[in-house]
Amino acid sequence: MFKIKGLRWYMIGLVTIGTVLGYLTRNAIAAAAPTLQEQLHISTQQYSYIIAAYSACYTIMQPVAGYVLDVLGTKVGYAMFAILWALFCAGTALANSWGGLAVARGAVGMAEAAMIPAGLKASSEWFPAKERSVAVGYFNVGSSIGGMLAPPLVVWAIMAHSWQMAFLITGALSLVWALCWLYFYKHPKDQKKLSTEEREYILSGQEAQHQAGNAKRMSAWQILRNRQFWGIALPRFLAEPAWGTFNAWIPLFMFKAYGFNLKEIAMFAWMPMLFADLGCILGGYMPMLFQKYFKVNLIVSRKLVVTLGALLMIGPGTIGLFTSPYVAIACCASAALPTSPCPVR
């Protein structure tokens, strides 16, 4: 049978496309917010409830989604969640009030809670430990790409047809991807198009529990007592409000504060996401550059990256000092840059 060279990179490419489409469906509500406010007479406070519904359901469902993925496996579990978020996203088109939108987006949040855990699980299955951070970096880039695509695509759908069409299109794209995932994704042990050499390279470079396929699950109490867990959770808790702001509020901010029309939103609202992508790439190289040119060790170099990121986060706090909308966008973009290299991402 024909073997595909470097098949693991095709698999992470498939994961990345799923992340792109997941964040496209997530950010569609933000790009459509000005139109929704006008046509459904939704206040800014009511819009915040819609966003809160998504975030709350996403948060509550994440540990449940991780458990379901462990039980059903990456292939079936991720496909199931992706089909659900695609249908719920398309179902958003049926809403005619802020309450209906909150229910629909909450359902999307519950399904999309599996997106990042599934990506991490696929990376652990398909990559040796030494390459896993690179693989995770690739599919994390998909989150920003999805955020970049949402404003122009959603605005185009609204101007060409209606806001309902924007959610139907984004939902349909995710549904197509879910079916492709179900067809193409297999564990390395079951993938017949994977060469023997690459299979051995992947499995020999994995931790013992992945090789044997019998990783022991940690209890909730063990996780909460784990220092590594808190090393990831605390930075995320502190940085996630910024990332959530970029995902949910920039189009509406540009519309309310600077009077941008839909075309202008489509032209500029994606820029912070572009800088988040750049940060995701640069964040991997900056520690090496600090070590090379400043002669510091690995730990210090990583601390310098995090410190530099924290300084850049000051940008949005200075928006009130300027009247130019383009300076405001630049301030937001500067703060989006470190959301990827920091531990939160």
From Swiss-Prot:
Deleted gene: phenotype: Mutation of the gene causes a reduction in growth on D-galacturonate and maceration of potato tuber tissue.
Regulation: Inhibited by cyanide and 2,4-dinitrophenol, but not by arsenate.
Main location: membrane
Name the UniProt record assigns to this protein: Galacturonate transporter
Keyword Repeat applies: no
Gene label: exuT
Entry's induction text: Induced in the presence of D-galacturonate. Expression is regulated by ExuR. Maximal transcription activity is observed within 8 hours of bacterial inoculation into potato tubers, well before any visible symptoms of disease are detected.
InterPro entries found in the cross-reference section: MFS, MFS_dom, MFS_Na/Anion_cotransporter, MFS_trans_sf
Topological category with respect to the lipid bilayer: Multi-pass membrane protein
GO MF, one annotated term: hexuronate transmembrane transporter activity
Organism of provenance: Dickeya chrysanthemi
Assigned keywords, A-Z: Cell inner membrane, Cell membrane, Membrane, Signal, Transmembrane, Transmembrane helix, Transport
Residues in the signal sequence: 1-32
Compartmental location: Cell inner membrane
Reactions catalysed, as given in the entry: aldehydo-D-galacturonate(out) + H(+)(out) = aldehydo-D-galacturonate(in) + H(+)(in)
Family classification: Belongs to the major facilitator superfamily. Phthalate permease family.
Task performed by this protein: Transport of D-galacturonate. Cannot transport the dimer digalacturonic acid. Uptake is an active process.
Domain of life: Bacteria
Pfam families: MFS_1
Gene Ontology terms: cellular component: plasma membrane
Positions of transmembrane segments: 49-69, 76-96, 100-120, 139-159, 165-185, 237-257, 265-285, 304-324
